[in-house]
Amino acid sequence: MAAAGARHYTSKDGSQHDLVRGIWKLLRLHTPEGLSTASIGWLALFFYAIQQQLSFESLRYTFLGIFACYQITHGVFCMWNDICDRDFDAQVARTKKRPLPSGMVTYTEAMVAFIIGLALSLGVTYAMLGEDVTLTMGPIWGLSFIYPLCKRAIWAPQAVLGLTMAACVLPPWVALGNDATNAKLPASLFGAIFSWLVYLDLIYASQDRPDDEKAGVKSLAVFLGDKLKACLTVLGALQIAFFAVAAFEASASSFLWVFGIAVWAISVPWSILSLNPRDRNSGGRIFLVNAILGIYLAAVSGTDVWLSSR
């Protein structure tokens, strides 16, 4: 909600201008999505800690640094995505009430907020995680910048998003002082997150497919058509396999295998079977469940680290 006393007024086209509330929503601070992004970094951090037998207490500052860096980065580039997609969003039923197409925030206001947020993301990352991690974040920021533009150029922008989010497993690896040697664990986590994010975004995009076709948005969900569930099945099998390899490489305990990997494996067929592409609300519900599942797996792996430290 907008802060008390925030300035808002009705624009000429009848839309409500509310800068504070609009920026809040552009940053996605009204949803748990940012926490879901941070959970990818936490998940990787805990898997590395299990492998290296690090105590939970030794991870606290890195844990907080990952949260701050990923939360700000997620919000800033969600804003950038909405800036780039403002014309498309106005044509899609689910997104036409977002701050920019609805007139809640102007283009200039959003651009100023984006530039400030980008500088803040860089500063916080450098201050809390150091130079090496800041350099490792570079490809993530770069891919996040080009992702919205890919919707106009290629039929698989989800692959770019998958690469962006998969790269989030690398800064925690560097933060713990590791290098490119013996990189099987980060490589397997990279594969798992890539498969999961493409799978997850396909589920999310399925609810917008009719509007995307009309608006000319390039989307893998549109391209696949009736083959959507077949592709989801392949991606689901890949993420289970990659997570299993990661758990093996980390020498995970039975606790993580049972409450983490097994639960994840069960969730995949449930998600695919529950998805109804003809029901616009179906994709959103399953997307939310899977976003929470990512936080859950991070919590399970963190609990494993804590139990091992006792």
Swiss-Prot record:
* Cofactor(s) the protein requires to work: Mg(2+)
Q: Where in the cell is it found?
A: Membrane
* Ranges that cross the membrane: 30-50, 63-83, 110-130, 154-174, 185-205, 230-250, 255-275, 286-306
Q: Which UniProt keywords apply?
A: Membrane, Transferase, Transmembrane, Transmembrane helix
Q: Return the broad EC class.
A: transferase
Single GO MF annotation: transferase activity, transferring alkyl or aryl (other than methyl) groups
- Give the metabolic or biological pathway: Secondary metabolite biosynthesis; terpenoid biosynthesis
Instruction: Tell me how this protein sits in the membrane.
Output: Multi-pass membrane protein
The EC number(s) attached to this protein equal 2.5.1.-
Enumerate the Gene Ontology biological process terms.
terpenoid biosynthetic process
Pfam families, alphabetized: UbiA
The keyword Nucleus belongs to this UniProt entry's keyword annotation: no
Instruction: Give a Gene Ontology cellular component term annotated to this protein.
Output: plasma membrane
* Function noted in UniProt: olyprenyl transferase; part of the gene cluster that mediates the biosynthesis of the meroterpenoids nectripenoids A and B, as well as cochliquninone D and isocochliquninone E. The pathway probably begins with the HR-PKS ntnH that catalyzes two chain-extension steps to form a reduced triketide, which then primes the SAT domain in the NR-PKS ntnG to initiate three more cycles of extension to give a linear hexaketide corresponding to the polyketide part of nectripenoids.
Family to which this protein belongs: Belongs to the UbiA prenyltransferase family.
Alphabetical list of PANTHER family matching this protein:
4-HYDROXYBENZOATE POLYPRENYLTRANSFERASE, MITOCHONDRIAL (PTHR11048:SF28), PRENYLTRANSFERASES (PTHR11048)
Q: Under what name is this protein listed?
A: Polyprenyl transferase ntnF
The species is Nectria sp
